[in-house]
Amino acid sequence: MSLAEDWIDPNSSEDSDIQEDAELEYTADNPEKEQRGVFSLEKVQLQFPVSIRCLAVENNILVMALTSDKLMIVDLERPEDIIDIELPKKVLALGLTYKIFLDPSGHYIFVTTTAGDNCLFTPSHQGRVLTKLKGHTVEAVQWNLNGGNILELLIASKSGVLLELVLTLDSANLKRIEKSINTLYSFPFMESPMGILKNIQDDSMTIVTNKRILRFEPKTSRGKDQLYFSPAFQGSMKEILSFSEEETAQCFSYSPFPKNLAEPYTLALKTSKRIIYLDIMNPVNPDIQDYEFNESPKLSVPTVEMNMILTSFHLAFLDLDTLYIVNRVNGKESYQQRVNLSPHEEILGLCCDHEKNTYWLYTTDSLHELVVNNETREASLVFLEKGDFEKALECANTAKVRNTVLVGYAEFLMEHEEYERAATLYAETLKSVEEVALKFIELNQKDVLRLYLWKKLRSYKSTMKIQKSLLVNWLLELMLAKLNSLDEKERLELFPENVMQQRQQVQREFSTLLNQYKDEINREAAYNLANNYGKEEQLLQIATVMKDQSYIMHYWVQRENYEKALETLNEGVSQETLIQHATALLTHRPNETVSIWERQTDLDVHALIPSLLSYNQRSHVPVEENAAIRYLRYVTGVLGCVDPSIHNTLFCIYACHSSSNESYLMNYIEQQGNHPLYDMDLGIRLCLQFNCRRSAVKILVLMKLYSQGVELALEADDCELAATIANIPEEDVVLKKTLWQTIAKYMFSKKSGIKETLRFLENSEVLQLPELIRLLPEDIKLDDLSDNVCDELDHCMKRIEQLDFEIGQASEVAHEIQTNAENMRNRYIVLEPNESCWHCNQPLFSEPFVLFPCQHAFHRSCMLEKTYKLASEKNILKECQLCGPSYAVRLINEPFSTDF
């Protein structure tokens, strides 16, 4: 597949069509190029009951005057609806229909006769005879409907005068519509007007007569209440052209109003000797072109009165029964067609619809339409052949023709070494990019090539991804090469000011290309180009536009520019990139790196563990300055991370630094509490590995491995710590005793300070001297224990004496209780029969009562009631009535329940 094939998007049908069209290029060797189908004469399928006398058409409204004194009105948009109108008898009393005129909308119809009678038909097809125009056979009419009920007509009379007729179009009084008539201009004897042309730009009037062409221009702008046509004739008159006495005008026509700058706005006048073209758009210095008869002898035969019309670029005329069309641009014949006539049929003339740009040929018995198919297409190729490229482009209304014109124009500019303009035009064509680029490369026009590729790139559609990508990378290479070339010039001090301006221009182009076409950039190819050309600034610019922070960071780390790398990290990079360069950044910029990490709360901390451990191994800083510890403390403390691997890592780093100071690890273990997040088995191994025995003991205690903890503490010769551990299991006396025995054995095995050892072991509260003596080594003399034994015996004696005293006190209390009980059995009180209750004064024996030693007696119910009244709810609710102290005391003398 060639490079040229890459420029056409196979998925774009539009581009394919343009490419196929572009294959047909204009060449002078092919005279039939683009001519086929431009003009065709087609007969209209209309049946006429009688012959046609004259015809007019405007705005697709076609009106024919028939020999039957009727008007046939055909709306070409609805040709099936034909309207017949009878002409007023007054109009045709003395003459025949001479001409028909239509206003630009086609709604008003003006009919004039050979006898000078005239009538006007309104949109409702009501005819009114214009009596004020009696005797004037009209040659031309200009219309002005001011939007109200006033219709102004500028009339050219065959009698040699210009008239302004004002009509009132009041539907209530259509019988009297003529308001006023004024004579604006009178022509000399033997001079009669043939046509009127209104210039819409300056309200001037161009009048064509049989002797000359005049232009009437108003001096001032028209007043609010002033008539429309009068000001032009009150101003200046300029004679544009006059004919000799031997030459008279026969007919005239003007072209449609131009749609573009290439179309001429032309008035054509046929005389007895020649055809004259007049440029209407330039009234001051008109461009008058003569078309001599010797170019086409056929024109010398005037068969009908109106045998000539103008299209946008062509002249159509009749010669006997043949229609000829000549291109006005190059004067060559473009079309001819013989009109088939019946034995008694005659051609009457040609007619033009200036509103819809349609053209008609009519005979006595038939109507033909001159169909114009894309006339500007042929005109464009003719302008191209003449080298008038600007007009050719104006007229190029198809992709095929425009491509042909652009290619021709560009090749012309290449021949004249106007390379930049040629590049701009080439970019608009479908010519292969490879072919055009080779032309500029062969001419060593690299700047022009860059311009061409720029223009071409901007012309591509969004769907042409591959082509755009190729051009973007090509442009990148050209710009990088240009920058290197400018650097070399600057190094040699050649034109420094010019070099600076060029560099700024290329840099602007480079930035624009990256910003506008970043989606089409091949990232790897662009990086390779920038690296190959050694353009660091542009390389980073590409990566920045592509938002490839990973590449930028990799670039700076490779070059050990850690400040720039940190700036990139702060702007945000992918997790993968951050992890990839974490070790390097931690090693060289630890605190700054951790500060940035702390602002990125969504990091995969687990993936950073290798970098943190590597940094910890390489760095030789105290715990307070260790960035790994700082970050892990932030993650576990602030972010609340509970991942065991993170806590294990922090534990490991603490352990590494605990050989000199174990307090940080101890604090961490204490902070973790009884349910730590680190692995305690791993923690013990790490503590043993780094000789952190106190920390290991703490972990063993947390695991309730008291025996191992005591043994480890004793291995560290820390009896105080071992004693602390032994006192922890308060409820398990057996275990506690075993632990203390282990401590005792260890301390006795050291054979130093037996007295101090025994004094220390006495604090255990679980080991007695006899037990300690059994634990003593055999080689220890009892003399060393005499003081301790004596102290122990004294302690036992004091204890025995204390127990004897307590027993004596208990015996005395028991004897006293027994004596009181015996006395209570022999005690009684005598009650009289009339004894009453001390509360209610009722007889005491009437119901159950209570008698107290003080000889007061109460009914049981009265006593309870009195108690309820005196006791508060708070006192009643103070204790349980079954097990409260007061109740329990009362139950001392009660027998045991049989239900128990």
UniProtKB/Swiss-Prot annotation:
Chain segments annotated as transmembrane: none
CDD domains (alphabetical): RING-H2_Pep3p-like (cd16462)
Protein location: Vacuole membrane
GO biological process: endosome organization; Golgi to endosome transport; intracellular protein transport; late endosome to vacuole transport; organelle fusion; vacuole organization; vesicle docking involved in exocytosis; vesicle tethering
RING-type zinc-finger residues: 837-884
Keyword Zinc on entry: yes
Membrane topology: Peripheral membrane protein
TPR repeats: 314-345, 373-406, 408-436, 546-579
Keyword vocabulary terms for this entry: Membrane, Metal-binding, Repeat, TPR repeat, Vacuole, Zinc, Zinc-finger
CHCR repeats: 602-756
Region ranges (Disordered): 1-20
Described function: Required for vacuolar biogenesis.
Family, per entry: Belongs to the VPS18 family.
Protein's recorded name: Vacuolar membrane protein pep3
Organism: Schizosaccharomyces pombe (strain 972 / ATCC 24843) (Fission yeast)
Gene responsible for this protein: pep3
